Amino acid sequence: GLDDYYIDRDKILPGPDGKLDLEHINTIDTDLFRHDLKRLLAGEEVELPSFSFKLGKRVWKGHKLKLERDSVIIVEGLHALNPVLLPEDIAPNLVFRMYVSALIPLNLDNHNRIPTSYLRLLRRTVRDYETRNSPVQRTLSMWASVQRGERRWIFPYQENADVIFNSATLYELAVIKKHIYPLLTAVEP
């Protein structure tokens, strides 16, 4: 996934507001990603990086990959549709782009729908807490920046997708409640 190509957190320059913009495309080592992708497509073995969210830096674990004949590469991550990731010499007909998002189809009543951003926030809060060692308060305080990043770096490229896949399920809020409720009730108002 593209998360493993994050640059070390201490090398990220703060934005005009003095805060780190972790949604910016420049947080991804696009040069290394393109280099590794070209080597994989050329049939070479590549040692893939791994990003430690606990340490805030890239680590090398010796995970090597070499494609078999007729293999498919799946690039997963927020910036996967951004054209800057693809080397110019990759033929467009060899690339199939899929935009995956939780497009929740639920309404509170006849006039008020549940915004898709709510489900994304709930998902991210649980993910950050369980897999990135991030307190709930940190995720909540970053949400405005995340949404700015979506508007600037994600949504403009969804039109590049060949297909859009809705990853939400009708019962998801009921399932996620078990995980999110204890986290949110522990947050100080």
Please identify what each model-predicted range represents.
Residues 72-76, 99:
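Structural recognition of the conserved hydrophobic beta-strand(s) that form the central parallel beta-sheet
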Residues 84-189:
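Conserved NTP phosphate-binding and transfer environment spanning the P-loop NTPase/kinase superfamily
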Residues 67-69, 92-93:
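Short loop/turn elements that form and flank the Walker-type P-loop nucleotide-binding site
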